[in-house]
């Protein structure tokens, strides 16, 4: 099964997430099929908090990819902002 989820990056206590399409069996931060964007929960000032290619996300959802709960809410947020 293919899922759209977040892969954690960044430093200790400074999370930064890539939003990726991956096989459900692969590790959280491991192999992925395609990168759709990023999410920075600690963005300050002029930093971008969320960047997501909504068209690619919609295409993967149409193909049957299942988004995680958090990614589903981020897709909704990105659509509203666009």
Curated annotation (Swiss-Prot):
Gene3D superfamilies: 3.30.1320.10. GO terms for biological process: translation. The keyword ATP-binding does not apply. One of its GO terms (molecular function) is structural constituent of ribosome. Keywords: Ribonucleoprotein, Ribosomal protein. The keyword Metal-binding does not apply. It holds the Pfam family Ribosomal_S16. GO terms for cellular component: cytoplasm; small ribosomal subunit. NCBIfam families: S16 (TIGR00002). Belongs to the bacterial ribosomal protein bS16 family. This is Small ribosomal subunit protein bS16. The lineage of its organism: Bacteria, Pseudomonadati, Pseudomonadota, Gammaproteobacteria, Thiotrichales.
């Amino acid at each position: 099964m293919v899922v759209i989820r977040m892969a954690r990056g960044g430093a200790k206590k400074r999370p930064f997430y890539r939003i990726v399409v991956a096989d459900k069996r692969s590790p959280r931060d491991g192999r992925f099929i395609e990168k759709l964007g990023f999410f920075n929960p600690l963005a300050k000032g002029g930093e971008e908090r969320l960047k997501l290619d909504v068209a690619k996300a919609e295409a993967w959802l149409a193909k049957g990819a299942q988004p995680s709960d958090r990614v589903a809410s981020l897709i909704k947020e990105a659509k509203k902002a666009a």
